[in-house]
Structure formats: structure tokens, C-alpha cells
């Protein structure tokens, strides 16, 4: 009888959580309609593709928990970084390695990257805690004023120089309304690109949105902003590092974060839930032209972990063609 009552109580609490989420969504939707909209300019979206906006110098941290089978995947990310025409400084954080494994890792890096550092962390209780060690690297890098930007990547994420250029340009445009340009993570499968992190389509009239005057272009705020990386300028990183978002328990006070992100994922998305403007789910917004997501905001997930597993497909992940994501 006692177990039966506990199960009933658990289901009630779960239902309350779902109701709370719906209420929050409704408040955001109504506020979005009543508040005056910030109007972007059409020329912003034309200008961003005419020129490459480069960082002065970028510190990059890749989180790589060593597995020999993942070296090929890591190499794809390294190849992309090696193609950048601006000044980079790469740090790879990993677990404690055998000598032969460290040689293999060094071989991949040395072949493509001039300046890099491998930092090994011993006695990790679990591989999910490795990303949190990136904080110590970023705290060290921010002290050096020569760095203008900072990027954290999981080992299977491919970010192009065009992605970085777009972010730098729109960071300045969106800064005065406390929003941050986001990326959409996709997997290429059978000649098509599929969204990885959105189990549902992003509906324009159900999510916070900012239009240009013509309403041809704009930014939309998704409830599912995760992309397995972050890019920050000095101001963003400083604010992040001194905030409560760098604590593992930060998500405990946020029902959305608690339901969406395990410990490993929290480190590269928690900043999006700091100081969120009134009518938004989070601070990250995604660009669109009509109902199309521009190529410059699409990043690649080189390891096909979402489009193939049926268990994830049943939940909606890895099933939505990027062309149909915004409706």
C-alpha cells in the first residue's frame, strides 16, 4: 500500500512539472505578443555573407575522452580548425592516457596544428565530468588579453570559419537586447541534413521571434538550444566564469535545464540560462530567412549518433530535415 501511494504521489508531481512547463510556455508566448518587438534590419542578413569577420585570436578547447575508435572523428574536427585563416590556440583535455595512446593523439594534432597543448586529468570519477575541467583552461586563457574569442567543442563537432564569422557579426547586433546568436547542430545522412537537438519543429507563432522590417529575415528562440559547443567573446566568458552557471547544481533551480541536460551537457549550455530577457526561453537565438535556416549557422555533428538509433528517433531526435525545422 505504501509503495502504491508513493507511485501515485510521484505521478502527481510529474504531472505538476508538465503543467508548470506549459504555463511557462504560455506566459512567454503572451508576453512575446504584448511587448514591443525589436526590429532588425534586412541589410544585417545581406552584410553577414559579404565579408568574413575574424577573431583577433581564438582559444579553443576540445573535450576528448580517449577512445581509439573516436580518433577519426576527432581528426575531422582538427582538419576544420587547421583550415582557419586566423590565429588559433588549441587545448585538448583528456583522461589519463597510456603512452601509446598519447602518441596516437599527438600524431593527429602535430600533423595539422602548429600550437596545441594536451592536458590529462587523472582519477576522473566518470567521463561525464571531463567537460567541467575546461573551466580551468578558460580561466587561464581569459587572463591573456591577446585572446578575443573562446570556443569549447565536443570532439565530434565541426565548426567552420563561416560559422565563427556569422557569430562575431550578429553578436554585436544582438548584444544590446541581451541575446546571443546560436548554431544548429545537424547530421548529414543520405544526402540530407537532420537536426540533432530539436525533437519538434520550431513553430514561429509559438516561440519568441524577432523580425526585420520586411519580415523576410529574423531570429527565433528555441526551447532546445543545445549544440554541444559554445563560442564567446571576452565579455561573455568573464560573466560566465564568475557566475553560478559554472556550478554543477545550477540546473537544480531551473526545471527546463533539469529535464533536458545531463551533467556532461550542462557545461556548454548553462550560460544560455543566465540573465534571460523577460519573454525568452533562454538567451540563444537562431537566424532564419523565410522558413530556412542559413548555412552559416549550421554546424556538423560528424558522429552519426542521432539519425540512426530508433530509440532516439521515436522521441523525435534526428528525424527533422533542417529544411523543415522552422514552420
Spell out what each predicted region is:
Residues 243-327:
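C-terminal catalytic/acceptor-binding lobe
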Residues 1-39:
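Boundary detector for helix-to-coil junctions that initiate low-complexity/charged tails
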Residues 24-79:
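N-proximal low-complexity "stem/linker" segments adjacent to membrane-targeting elements
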Residues 160-250:
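Conserved catalytic core of nucleotide-sugar-dependent glycosyltransferases
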Residues 147-158:
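Short beta-strand-to-loop acidic/aromatic patch adjacent to the donor-nucleotide binding site
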Residues 76-88:
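Short, acidic, metal-binding catalytic loop of nucleotide-sugar glycosyltransferases
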Residues 88-97, 122-123:
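Short beta-strand/loop segment that forms part of the nucleotide-sugar
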Residues 101-148:
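Active-site-proximal specificity loops/subdomain of glycosyltransferases
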Amino acid at each position: 500500500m505504501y509503495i502504491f501511494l508513493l507511485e501515485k504521489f510521484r505521478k502527481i508531481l510529474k504531472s505538476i512539472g508538465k503543467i508548470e512547463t506549459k504555463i511557462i510556455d504560455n506566459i512567454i508566448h503572451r508576453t512575446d505578443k504584448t511587448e514591443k518587438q525589436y526590429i532588425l534590419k534586412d541589410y544585417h542578413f545581406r552584410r553577414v555573407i559579404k565579408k568574413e569577420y575574424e577573431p583577433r585570436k581564438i582559444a579553443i578547447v576540445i573535450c576528448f575522452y580517449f577512445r581509439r575508435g573516436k580518433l577519426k572523428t576527432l581528426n575531422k574536427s582538427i582538419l576544420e580548425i587547421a583550415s582557419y585563416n586566423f590565429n588559433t590556440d588549441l587545448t585538448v583535455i583528456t583522461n589519463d592516457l597510456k603512452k601509446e595512446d598519447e602518441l596516437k593523439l599527438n600524431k593527429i594534432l602535430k600533423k595539422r596544428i602548429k600550437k596545441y597543448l594536451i592536458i590529462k586529468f587523472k582519477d576522473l570519477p566518470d567521463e561525464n565530468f571531463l567537460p567541467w575541467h575546461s573551466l580551468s583552461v578558460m580561466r587561464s586563457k581569459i587572463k591573456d588579453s591577446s585572446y578575443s574569442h573562446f570556443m569549447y567543442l565536443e570532439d565530434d563537432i565541426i565548426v567552420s570559419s563561416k560559422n565563427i564569422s556569422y557569430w562575431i557579426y550578429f553578436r554585436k547586433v544582438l548584444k544590446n537586447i541581451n541575446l546571443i546568436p546560436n548554431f544548429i547542430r545537424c547530421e548529414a545522412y543520405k544526402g540530407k541534413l537532420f537536426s540533432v537537438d530539436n525533437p519538434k519543429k520550431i513553430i514561429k507563432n509559438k516561440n519568441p521571434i524577432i523580425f526585420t522590417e520586411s519580415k523576410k529575415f529574423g531570429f527565433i528562440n528555441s526551447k532546445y538550444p543545445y549544440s554541444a559547443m559554445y563560442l564567446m567573446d571576452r565579455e561573455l566568458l568573464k560573466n560566465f566564469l564568475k557566475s553560478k552557471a559554472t556550478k554543477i547544481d545550477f540546473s537544480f533551480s531551473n526545471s527546463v535545464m533539469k529535464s533536458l541536460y545531463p551533467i556532461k551537457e550542462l557545461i556548454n549550455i548553462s550560460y544560455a540560462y543566465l540573465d534571460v530577457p523577460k519573454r525568452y526561453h533562454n538567451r540563444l537565438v537562431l537566424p532564419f530567412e523565410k522558413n530556412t535556416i542559413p548555412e552559416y549557422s549550421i554546424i556538423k555533428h560528424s558522429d552519426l549518433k542521432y539519425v540512426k538509433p530508433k530509440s532516439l528517433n521515436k522521441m523525435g531526435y534526428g528525424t527533422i530535415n533542417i529544411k523543415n525545422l522552422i514552420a
